[in-house]
Amino acid sequence: MKILVDENMPYARDLFSRLGEVIAVPGRPIPVAQLADADALMVRSVTKVNESLLAGKPIKFVGTATAGTDHVDEAWLKQAGIGFSAAPGCNAIAVVEYVFSSLLMLAERDGFSLHDRTVGIVGVGNVGRRLQARLEALGIKTLLCDPPRADRGDEGDFRSLDELVQRADILTFHTPLFKDGPYKTLHLADEKLIRSLKPGAILINACRGAVVDNTALLTCLNEGQKLSVVLDVWEGEPELNVELLTKVDIGTPHIAGYTLEGKARGTTQVFEAYSKFIGHEQHVALDTLLPAPEFGRITLHGPLDQPTLKRLVHLVYDVRRDDAPLRKVAGIPGEFDKLRKNYLERREWSSLYVICDDASAASLLCKLGFNAVHHPAR
């Protein structure tokens, strides 16, 4: 059995070698010759999986180690009798922590408290729900918009997108990319929406680049609209609008979900799905794969305020470490993908063990996802 895996999927070689011969290949572009005798293909979001790639090939299963699936033609795979699995929710925690790192940086720079802001969350799936929970644990008001879930009658106080635009100080997008249909998200943030945002609002896109109309956004920024922008995703990736990058406050190369834990979850989820597909079901405990974190433990004295939270968050991950490298190489062919391929190891908040002498601080940090304990001061 021959299994092709994206060379940037951590732990893929070790795990899939339990099931057969493993060949690591680049994800963009996939070397088509390798598909001629392969049984399975494991990809990330950079690989377009469709009829033109796989027609006439012996591939029996495709796995994507990503939550999103808009790079995969699922209908064609089903028609062709090819098994498929994604990794829903694998990087949701990472994306939430990316948003927090960005917001805490902007709050410190611009001198505001997040408690004084209302956050509108567009898309309330794996990422949106977790973001809502952490924001509300901090006492920050949220507004939710998710028409598909609202129409299904899912639990939640869902509001219209127009209401979020009118009321939210921060608008953050966490939707799939639907190019048509009743829940179309292509250019969901169009010129009309962008112009309607509150003065001084913060716009965040960490889902799919085309959810925000990049040309319209640049037009509004060039005309002097008072707007802070955080973009992790771009229309036309791996190409991007370099002028737009110079105008946004934070710009990163589609790495919001790139924690080691998130990548490992993606790999293990598709590994488990494929092992079940071939009748050799196996389960993997994530903590058996991950290395010890860089920071063992720290001690926190007193209550948890916003400056202290910012220091803890940025100790684990400061979004500026990914903003600066992109600005240096933007516009140079191939560099966007190189930044992703050679991405520095990044951990999640749970990797940081925090000893608190304040019980409420320990409790709150645990709700936020840190590994915190209460040890009273002596």
UniProtKB/Swiss-Prot annotation:
Binding of substrate, residues: 45, 66, 258
Entry similarity comment: Belongs to the D-isomer specific 2-hydroxyacid dehydrogenase family. PdxB subfamily.
Source species, domain of life: Bacteria
PANTHER family listed in its UniProt record: FORMATE DEHYDROGENASE 1
Designated name of the protein: Erythronate-4-phosphate dehydrogenase
Pfam families cross-referenced by the UniProt entry: 2-Hacid_dh (PF00389), 2-Hacid_dh_C (PF02826), DUF3410 (PF11890)
Keywords: Cytoplasm, NAD, Oxidoreductase, Pyridoxine biosynthesis
InterPro entries per UniProt: D-isomer_2_OHA_DH_cat_dom, D-isomer_DH_CS, D-isomer_DH_CS1, D-isomer_DH_NAD-bd, Erythronate-4-P_DHase, Erythronate-4-P_DHase_dimer, NAD(P)-bd_dom_sf, PdxB_dimer_sf
SUPFAM superfamilies xrefs: Formate/glycerate dehydrogenase catalytic domain-like, NAD(P)-binding Rossmann-fold domains
Source organism per UniProt: Shigella flexneri
Complexes and interactors: Homodimer.
GO biological process, one term: 'de novo' pyridoxal 5'-phosphate biosynthetic process
Catalytic activity: 4-phospho-D-erythronate + NAD(+) = (R)-3-hydroxy-2-oxo-4-phosphooxybutanoate + NADH + H(+)
An example Gene Ontology molecular-function term: 4-phosphoerythronate dehydrogenase activity
Subcellular location: Cytoplasm
Originating gene: pdxB
Catalytic residues (positions): 208, 237, 254 (proton donor)
NCBIfam families: PRK00257.1 (NF001309), PRK15438.1 (NF011966)
EC number: 1.1.1.290
Residues noted as binding NAD(+) in the record, renumbered to the chain: 146, 175, 232, 257
Protein's pathway: Cofactor biosynthesis; pyridoxine 5'-phosphate biosynthesis; pyridoxine 5'-phosphate from D-erythrose 4-phosphate: step 2/5
Primary localization class, coarse: cytoplasm
GO cellular component: cytosol
Chain's role: Catalyzes the oxidation of erythronate-4-phosphate to 3-hydroxy-2-oxo-4-phosphonooxybutanoate.
